[in-house]
Design a protein with these regions (language model features):
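Hydrophobic alpha-helical transmembrane segments of membrane proteins
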Residues: 1-90, 100-260
Length: 260
């Protein structure tokens, strides 16, 4: 399968890198940092329901959290700027006898299957266990976790689309700015954003099929747009030149230039 072959080649490329030993130490630090934040998110997920119960006595804690889902998605969107886009990863495979569109599609599948899409569950699962389980049981917690994962996958494809367009032309930065500005206005001055977010979150907890289908449709649409955009941006990405620092030589050695 092409997906497993590309994954195996990526691991071999990392091992053959001259900086492999140093990269292993860097990976260890990354894993340690990730474990720290995972533990921190679990702690927040366990303690936050108590604060919500005291601060919003007329609402269930999971309703308060669901109203804040757009904020979590925005933070997740910003964090994903640390990852490369598929057009940045496709270069080693262009000489292979494989269709470029097929390569793009496989790399996009990798985007949806990244472990980072599960990272926020360190917060949402403990929170749901404290607040959702008493009303909807373990099934409600599992359904909620599945819905959150699907939202993060959709957010991953949205982030890839924006980053790819932004690398092509800086004017595309107005796309996410405009979208999040509208959400901010709708959230602070009107209630339709928080109302929709609360309704979606509760539908996910209750296992409503339409909620999952709606997110899957968004994922499919974003994946299709990414497939077309990534294909159009391949060669512009390959032709991009990285800025190399210029080495300045000392003036007292200029006389050597005359002798070649």
């Amino acid at each position: 399968m092409l997906l497993t072959e590309i994954r195996r080649n990526q691991k071999l490329a990392a091992k053959r890198n001259p900086m492999y030993d140093r990269n292993r130490f860097a990976k260890f630090l990354i894993y340690l940092f990730t474990a720290f934040w995972a533990a921190y998110l679990i702690l927040i997920g366990v303690t936050l329901p108590i604060a919500f119960e005291e601060g919003f006595p007329t609402m269930e804690p999971y309703d308060v959290l669901n109203a804040c889902l757009p904020g979590f998605l925005f933070i997740d969107f910003l964090l994903r700027f640390l990852f490369p886009t598929p057009t940045q990863q496709i270069k080693p495979y262009l000489l292979l006898p494989i269709k470029k569109q097929q390569l793009i599609n496989v790399l996009l599948v990798q985007v949806g299957l990244k472990a980072f899409n599960l990272f926020w569950l360190f917060f949402f699962v403990p929170f749901a266990a404290m607040t959702v389980e008493r009303f909807y049981g373990v099934t409600g917690v599992v359904c909620y976790a599945l819905g959150i994962w699907l939202l993060m996958v959709a957010n991953a494809y949205w982030s890839v689309l924006v980053r790819t367009l932004q690398r092509r032309h800086i004017v595309w930065v107005l796309l996410p700015v405009g979208c999040y500005a509208l959400l901010a206005v709708g959230g602070f001055f009107y209630s339709y954003v928080s109302d929709f977010s609360m309704a979606l979150g509760e539908a996910l907890i209750q296992g409503k099929i339409w909620a999952y289908l709606g997110i899957l449709v968004v994922i499919a649409l974003l994946a299709f747009l990414n497939s077309r955009v990534q294909m159009a941006c391949i060669y512009s990405e390959l032709n991009r030149r990285e800025k190399m620092p210029q080495v300045k030589y000392s003036g007292r050695y200029r006389f050597l230039n005359t002798s070649g």
